[in-house]
Design a protein with these regions (language model features):
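AMP-binding/adenylate-forming catalytic core of the ANL superfamily
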Residues: 43, 144, 150-199
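Alpha-helix/helix-capping structural signal
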Residues: 48, 71-72, 133
Length: 199
């Protein structure tokens, strides 16, 4: 694991003495072979990883729980993954490096729990997180008592605290758990022989 969420999954599995199956860098058919071989029951990954499992060809009934996290997902991907793993309970986790896991969702809509609803604000569609939910670090900069997450949301039901993530406020996007600057990617792509322009 190379990221905070990966470390959390690793240590949770380690403490529970669960078998870990390394599928990093493997082709789609190799991943499915290992799921069958080891009767994998839990998968925790980014939407990018789950998209690599497409297209749907077969059901895998050993999988009991699927967890999405690390980047924005969508309803279509949840539905397709449910077709592949029909017996799995599917959760979508919102976590930040600064605060850890904060919300879980069944689909692409998240709900702020009533018990901590007063620890969040939304300003100009950006989700702000209260300092009491964050670890202690000199690298955090606060606006009063709130940390700017740079995550933009849209309310589905503001009264009930239900929202959906729209995008990021800054240029950095999360791809497979890595922070990526699309502008830098564009420069590299444009340097390839035969590429005139990328958009």
């Amino acid at each position: 694991p190379t990221h905070m969420a990966g470390l959390q999954v690793f240590f949770q599995a380690f403490e529970n003495q669960n078998t870990l199956v390394n599928v990093f860098g493997l082709a789609r058919n190799e991943v499915y072979s290992l799921i069958e071989k080891y009767s994998v029951t839990h998968i925790s990954a980014t939407p990018t990883f789950y998209r690599l499992l497409l297209p749907f060809e077969k059901e895998y009934s050993s999988v009991q729980r699927i967890t999405f996290g690390g980047e924005k997902s969508d309803r279509h991907l949840f539905d397709v993954i449910h077709d592949i793993f029909p017996l799995a309970k599917i959760n979508n986790i919102y976590a930040s490096t600064e605060a850890g896991s904060l919300f879980a969702a069944k689909g692409d809509c998240f709900q702020i729990p009533v018990s901590i609803r007063d620890k969040f604000m939304v300003v100009d569609d950006e989700l702000l997180i209260h300092r009491s939910l964050l670890g202690r670090s000199e690298s955090f900069s606060f606006d009063g008592d709130y940390y700017h997450s740079n995550d933009l949301i849209e309310w589905v039901d503001q009264q009930e605290g239900i929202f959906r993530f729209k995008s990021r406020k800054n240029e950095l996007i999360n791809v497979g758990g890595y922070k990526v600057n699309p502008g830098e990617v564009e420069v590299v792509i444009n340097a390839i022989d035969g590429i005139r322009q990328s958009l």
